[in-house]
């Protein structure tokens, strides 16, 4: 349903941001 899809989308967003932050810590952030 719509709610589940929205939840999945939000989870993907959060996971993506966490991954980006992790990459920054490991490899160093480049603007």
From Swiss-Prot:
Expressed by the skin glands. GO terms for biological process: defense response to fungus; defense response to Gram-negative bacterium; killing of cells of another organism. The keyword Transferase does not apply. Keywords: Amphibian defense peptide, Antibiotic, Antimicrobial, Disulfide bond, Fungicide, Secreted. GO terms for cellular component: extracellular region. The keyword Secreted applies. Disulfide bonds join 24-29. Its main location: secreted. It comes from the Eukaryota. It holds the Pfam family Antimicrobial_2. It is found in: Secreted. Signal peptide: none annotated. Transmembrane segments: none annotated. InterPro entries: Antimicrobial_frog_2 (IPR012521). Belongs to the frog skin active peptide (FSAP) family. Ranatuerin subfamily. Antibacterial activity against Gram-positive bacterium S.aureus and Gram-negative bacterium E.coli. Has activity against C.albicans. This is Ranatuerin-2Ca.
């Amino acid at each position: 349903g719509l709610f589940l899809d929205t939840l999945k989308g939000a989870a993907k967003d959060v996971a993506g941001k966490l991954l980006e932050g992790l990459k920054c810590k490991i490899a160093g952030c480049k603007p």
